[in-house]
Amino acid sequence: MNGPHILDHYRTQLADQISERGNELPDFNPLNISPWLAMSLMQKSIRRGREDLALRSAATLLKISPERLWRRLCITAYEDIGVADYEVVSLVTAALKGKRLRAEIGGEWAVASYLIGIMCEAIKCRAADDLAVVIDWHPDLENARLDFTFKPIPELLKLATGNGTLPERALAVWYAIGTDRCSSSVLRERRGDPQAVFDYLCEIGFPDTVVDIAREGFRKCNEVIAPFTVPLWREAQQFARHAEPDDIPEEEMIGEVPGWAYDMHVREGNQAMARFLETDCKTTRWVEANLPPNGRVKFMGGILFRVESGLVSNRLRWEVGDDLRRMAEYECPGLRHKKAAEIMNLLRRDLPMLNEARHNVAT
């Protein structure tokens, strides 16, 4: 394992790139919003390549909650960029060493603003997050979710690199990492051994660079999407790839913040969804006909993520990533494929009414 040398290499590379940019930094112009809304806005702005908004939300976090800024950048790198640009993921991970490193290579704002720029520009791949959704909810994994719970870690490691499907192999990784550390609303809790997982991946031939960057990313953010990038990286080497933009709905500003920042991860976003569900439109009539009263806001928050919040400006298209996205969107919500597509289309058309509810909540 060459983890320290690999990380030192990327820290040197990051320092050189920041130095080449010179002393002219973007304006530090924070917004007057909560840290939760700032985190939502920053991550979704990076997804959409909106550097202007990403910088302002990053400045907000750096001013009022800097620890949230660095953790959110880490999560965004693995969740939204991943195997599409592992170089960018590596640079973000390298910057997480701590304040002393960042002070030595230009300071907090110099480093954060540089990372925001390259993350906005990077091609995006959300396969790691889609993979986590599939593992939790796909019906084809019901037996494996139970069976793998009780297997010893050496057996899980063999399953993680065996002949099973990618979701089955990643499920074995999750249990071996430990669901006590990376919790799931579905998987049973058990202890794991993260060090054994990363060591084993190195031993059987995964590139040290890929494994040790994921190891450090996991150490910093404690999210299972970091180790998922290792098997996904190998899969990505086997398929033709190209990038294209998602079909993103028209944006509506609510003060200085776009409506799409108000999603299920923000209190105001859930309040707006609850108000929207009290209106009369095709989406709410569908909800009345198909969903029990309890849990409607949460369910529709997940649908909203698929039609607005989770969209990206430049998505990596490749067979495995496309399959995982399809499985997560249409085969996991507990609805038949036809109905999942139906409610997504209805909500997309009724987004102007949701934005009106967002305006009412925000003001």
What would you call each of these model-derived segments?
Residues 22-23, 53-56, 63-363:
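C-terminal alpha-helical interaction modules of replication/initiation AAA+ assemblies
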Residues 25-34:
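TPR-adjacent "capping" and linker segments in tetratricopeptide-repeat scaffold/adaptor proteins
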Residues 31, 38-60:
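Conserved helicase/translocase motor-coupling segment
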